Every structure is written in C-alpha cells, then in structure tokens.
Amino acid sequence: MPQVAASSSNVGPSSAAASSASHVQEVAKSASDPPKHTSFSSIGISPMLIRSLASLQIKVPTPIQSLTIPSVLEGRDLVGGAQTGSGKTLCFALPILNKLIKDMVGGFAVVLTPTRELGVQLHEQFVAVGEGARMGLRCALVLGGMDMMKQASELANLRPHVIVATPGRLVDHLRSGGGEEWGLRRCKFLVLDEADRLLTDTFKPELEYLYSVLPSAKTLQTLLFTATLTEQVVEFANAKRPEGKPAPMVCKIEMDTKTPETLEQRYVFVPSHVREPYLYHILRHPPIKPSSERVRKLNAKHQADRERKEENQRKSGKRRRTHHASDSDLDQDDDAALFLPATIIFTARCKTAATLSGMLAELGIPNVSLHSHLRQSERSENLQTFRAQRVPVLIATDVGSRGLDIPDVELVINWDLPSAWQDYVHRVGRTARNGKRGFAISFITERDIDVIHSIEDKINTKLTQLEGLEDEDKILEKLNAVATAKRVATMALHDSQFGERQQRNQHKQLARLKAEKRASKKAKSAGHDQQ
C-alpha cells in the first residue's frame, strides 16, 4: 500500500527521492490505516464546497488530501508529493476556495503549471468546484499558444480571483503593463504544480520575475506539488524563511511498487521489424471488451453518424466509400474499430507517436495523439476528443500525458518499454482504477529483456505472454497492408515538415542563453575593472 508521511523541514540533501526519510520515518504510516480525517468537514472545508464536491461524486478526502489540507488551511507553506490520480489538485484548490469565500478579492491565487494541457485540466477543476458552490468564482486561464490580446482583454475585464497559467505567458502579460489593472499585489497563494519541472533552468528567468512582482514571502503562502522530490524542490523546503514564518510542511504519499490487483499484465515478444502487424492485430482483436457504458455511448453515436451519412448520400445521389490502405487485405468491418476498449499506446518519442497515429488512421482505426510537437490547439482538441470517447485510441508520449488525469482507460499498450520501473507503474496505473478490470500489454524486443526483468523484480509480478497470437502466419498476412500504411504515414510526416518548428525554437532558445551568458560575463568583467 502507499505510505503516508509528513514532516516539517529540514529535508535532507543527497538522494532527492529519499531526502526526507530520516525526518518522516517516525510519523510514517500505511495509507490503509484509518486516516486522521475521514470527511471534508473534519478538515475544515466549507459546507458550500462540500455540497459542490458531493455533486461531483467526491465524498471523502484521499490520503494526500487528508494529510495536506489542514496544514494549508493553517497558513503553512507546503511541499506535497503524490502521483497523478491521487487527488492532489484539490489539495490546493479546496483551501484556496475555502479562504476565498471569506474574501473575494481579485488576484487571490496564482497557479503555475509547466504544460498547457495540465493548465486546462486545473482550470476545469477550479471552475467545476467553484460553480457547484455558487460562490461567483472568476478563474482565468493564461497559456502560451493562445491569442494574447484576447487574454489581456479577458484579464482586464474579468479581474480573476484565480489565475491558472504557464509561467512564460503570465510574465509576458505582466511585462506588457497589463498587470497594473488586474495585478498580483494582493495575491495570497502561489501554487507550483509539477514543481519538479517548474524548478529547473527552463523556467528560472520567468519564476525569478514573478517572485519580484508577487508579495513578499512573509505574506505569500507557497504550495509545491510534485511526484518527485528533486534537488530543487528540496532546496525550496530547506530555504531560509522570513522571521516568524515556520518551515514548510513536507507531506508525501510514497509511490506504491504494486500494480492494481484487477490489472492483467502481459507481454508480446516479437522482433522489432514486425511489431506493427501485431499491434494492428491486437487492436482489432483486443484482449478486453469495452465497458457496457462505453458500448452504449458508442452505439448511440454510431447510429447518429450512420443516419447522418445516409442522409448525405441520399442528398448527393451516390454512395461514398472511405478508402484505407489496401482495403482488400484488411478486416472489412471497419465499424468494429469504433468499438475498441479505451486504449492508450505509450511511445518514447514524438515522431513514433505521430507515425503510429498516421499508420493506424490509414488502417481504419480512429485515434488521436498527444505529444509536444503538436500545437496547443491540436493537443487540447485531441485530449478532449479522447476523453469524450469520440475515438477509442490515444497515442501519447510520457511527457505529453504527464500530470493529466484521463479516466476510464481499459487497455494500456507499452509500444516502447520505459527504462524506469516507476514510469511503468505510472503508465499501467492509468487503467484498472477503483476496482475496475484493466489490461496492460508491453511490446518486448531482444534489447528489452534486462529492463523487463528489472521491472518485474520491482513490482514483484511476473508478466505472462499474451494469448491469441499463436497463428503467426495469419497475423503477418497483414504485413504488406500495414507496411503500406506506415509508409504513407511516414511520407505525410515528411511533407508536413514534422519537428522543424521545435528545432527553430530550440535554436532561438540556445541563442538567447548564449547572449545572456555573454552579457553576464561582460557585467562581471566591468565590475572587476571598477575594483
């Protein structure tokens, strides 16, 4: 079971993952033990918010919520460590809204996130709880990749209580002078979600600027949430505090090395050059059936789509046919592709995700992808499409999907095996939640044998071979069709100049860093000359 631990700083240095061990061990306990707080009312949450939570089917606090919320309500700075799906968003959203009810001032809280997708998700959760409480919450979403002029107008007119933002875009607005109208002078809370990613050199200039315009640390309550206690997070916990301000609480739910009991874990051991036909076969003949609720929704949607298509065909006076790569070589019932279980396929690289997405689309399997080479609007649309069950398959990188809570996943496929066992647990943990049945399949090649053995040792579970793949000749009958689809997808990527925008941005960032380094050296040299 997960381990619950809490301590005040100091947090030790060295190994970040175990950095607080010597200080939290004496109060550590199993999450299966009766929690100190078993209801939201017992931790001081307003009845208005409790009613809102109930309408969202949230009845009792999770272990990390029970552990952190009382300290936040007491006014303590806090470092909270928990995995995706543990309910950590409410660890800061509920205390912020609880205090905001008593003092509805603009610029009350700033919530920073490293990714736009996570920002959208955080904003949705604030709005959902706030609307349910009927408290008149004004929450703004300030992300890069969106119309800055429109954002500036909304900020000025809305005067939001809570701002959910990526650091770069928020700094852009503040530097442009817009912050004078909706500024952060009265800000009470600063939240860094996915703090291990925010407290890196990538975001350092933006964070330093934000610290300079926010109220002093003496009055500002700072909350960090992370899955990993990195060195930078530890430095924050150990940093010198203003006189009279206590050290931050460090609360952590230790990651469980066990996978859910309702999760079936299998492997497919095939040479790398024939993996694609096996993937296609598995998706066409999945080892787990979609839930009855999913089938009901898909049936309704499918019937509506068919009626609309037939109506269009009657109007045009002819029948339309969708062409896929080598249709004669493929299973003819393309309608069945819509009735797949909700599936996430994890890849190691953006290009792999894009190639698989194009290939499967050519083969008649509806899907969307989620990776950093997509534009913000594309990522948001793709994520919403999968969440709304309009397509059955999401192809994602770890970075592209990190921090996102994607419910009701029934099948996880590791196309590329992660090198770290923690990543494996995190991936497969997206299915088999809340006692539901789930299935995880890992593709393994000759190079992955040591890695899979290491993962099995850590999770104390032996993966078994996936059944139903004995007829290799039948599976490889689709080899030509699948190869054609992959070739079409690869050519489409090449024609779209895939990845060139990211390369240009990297070159610009490198040039900026070099310029800053030269300026710093020049300033130091001038200082020495004056001495």
UniProtKB/Swiss-Prot annotation:
**Could you tell me the EC number(s) of this protein?**
3.6.4.13
The main enzyme category here is hydrolase
Q: Which UniProt keywords apply?
A: ATP-binding, Helicase, Hydrolase, Nucleotide-binding, Nucleus, Ribosome biogenesis, RNA-binding, rRNA processing
Q: Where is the composition biased (Low complexity)?
A: 1-28
All residue ranges annotated as the Helicase ATP-binding domain in the record: 69-247
Which parts of this chain are annotated as the region Disordered? 1-39, 291-331, 495-531
Gene Ontology cellular component annotations, sorted alphabetically: nucleolus; nucleus
Q: Which residues bind ATP?
A: A82, Q83, T84, G85, S86, G87, K88, T89
Q: Which SMART domains does this chain map to?
A: DEXDc, HELICc
Keyword ATP-binding belongs to the record: yes
Name one molecular function that GO assigns to this entry: RNA helicase activity
State if Protein transport is listed as a keyword. no
Q: Which PROSITE patterns has this protein been placed in?
A: DEAD_ATP_HELICASE (PS00039), HELICASE_ATP_BIND_1 (PS51192), HELICASE_CTER (PS51194), Q_MOTIF (PS51195)
Question: Which GO BP terms sit in this record?
Answer: rRNA processing
Placement of sequence motif Q motif: 38-66
Q: Which reaction does it catalyse?
A: ATP + H2O = ADP + phosphate + H(+)
Domain Helicase C-terminal positions: 332-531
Task: Please state which protein family the record places this protein in.
Answer: Belongs to the DEAD box helicase family. DDX49/DBP8 subfamily.
Q: What is known of its domains?
A: The Q motif is unique to and characteristic of the DEAD box family of RNA helicases and controls ATP binding and hydrolysis.
The UniProt function text for this chain reads:
ATP-binding RNA helicase involved in 40S ribosomal subunit biogenesis and is required for the normal formation of 18S rRNAs through pre-rRNA processing at A0, A1 and A2 sites. Required for vegetative growth.
Q: What is this protein called?
A: ATP-dependent RNA helicase DBP8
Organism, scientific name: Mycosarcoma maydis (Corn smut fungus)
Q: Gene for this protein?
A: DBP8
